[in-house]
């Protein structure tokens, strides 16, 4: 725990390393989703913790324009019952953890939705059955056999 900042009411929690939590998210996805192709979902909340989610069918992607993605992200933020500071957004999708157009589209929508609340997301990640990707930094991790 860091000492209190004079401009804040209480102590500041150090940022938590997201890598173990992302590993856990990959493991949970592998347990619940055995199919190679499944509908993507976007989440807002805490990795390996409380979250709000939206699942969209792959066949509906053509109608998911930027405005609708922003509305979905704003709605997820409105439904999130915890303090939004430190909140992350992540996309769960099939495929490999490499940057795709879908990732960038949802990252943009998340950034805009957070900005309307004068916040920045603590991270934007992609989780697949094979691993995870930090879309902002390009850091990723891939497993052939993940043991939790």
Task: Please tell me what each predicted stretch does.
Residues 38-41, 85-86, 122:
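Short, surface-exposed beta-edge/turn micro-motifs
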